[in-house]
Regions:
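N-terminal beta-strand motif that seeds the catalytic metal site of vicinal oxygen chelate
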Residues: 3-29, 87, 91, 142-152
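Residues that flank catalytic or metal-binding motifs in active/ligand-binding sites
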Residues: 17, 50, 57-59, 83-85, ...
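Core segments of cupin and vicinal oxygen chelate
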Residues: 23-67
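Vicinal oxygen chelate
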Residues: 28-29, 82, 87-134
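Conserved catalytic-core motifs of GNAT/GCN5-like acyltransferases
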Residues: 42-48, 115-118, 142-147
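A short, acidic/glycine-rich surface segment
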Residues: 69-75, 113-121, 148-149
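GNAT/GCN5-related N-acetyltransferase fold signature
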Residues: 130, 140-143
Length: 152
């Protein structure tokens, strides 16, 4: 089961570790359904018809009813061109596999299907890109050695 929940330290929510991002959602109900039913996230505080907070793997993602979409471009990186802007989450390998299964069962298309980067190095990871119903791009990933995330 995908764990899309707040992090706890000593039975308390680790508020200083929670990231907040607000994005345009287009049709709010449609986009909330994607985050809850496809990704397995839970909703929190909201203002009916205007915005909804989503527990996005322990981070606060606020979806705003909107008519606009964020413009996107592709940037070249080591494995090809990736969508920018994008946001996402790092997760355990088991949660990552569960999420892939949820996406595939929902028959939701990948923008960039799952692939491995940095094979054979300490930075090896598996990642994929999807978009929500309003075109916001998400990159979800799991690392073989998550402790090296910020290693230089």
């Amino acid at each position: 089961m995908v764990k899309c929940r707040l992090r706890h330290v000593n039975n308390e929510v680790a508020m200083s570790q929670i990231f907040h991002l607000a994005v345009p959602a287009g049709d709010l109900a449609t986009t909330v359904t994607f985050y809850t039913e496809v990704l397995g996230c839970q909703t929190g505080n909201s203002e009916h018809g205007r915005w909804v907070d989503v527990d996005f793997w322990g981070n606060e993602l606020t979806l705003h009813q909107s008519t606009e979409r964020l413009p996107g471009v592709r940037h070249d990186v080591d494995m090809g061109a990736v969508s920018v802007p994008h946001f996402g989450a790092h997760m355990s390998e088991s949660d990552f596999k569960d999420l892939k299964q949820r996406i595939e069962q929902a028959e939701h298309d990948y923008l960039d299907p799952p692939y491995r980067r940095f094979k054979g190095t300490e930075f090896e990871q598996e990642t994929f890109f999807i978009s929500d119903p309003n075109g916001n791009v998400l990159e979800m990933k799991t690392m073989v050695n998550p402790e090296v995330l910020f290693k230089t």
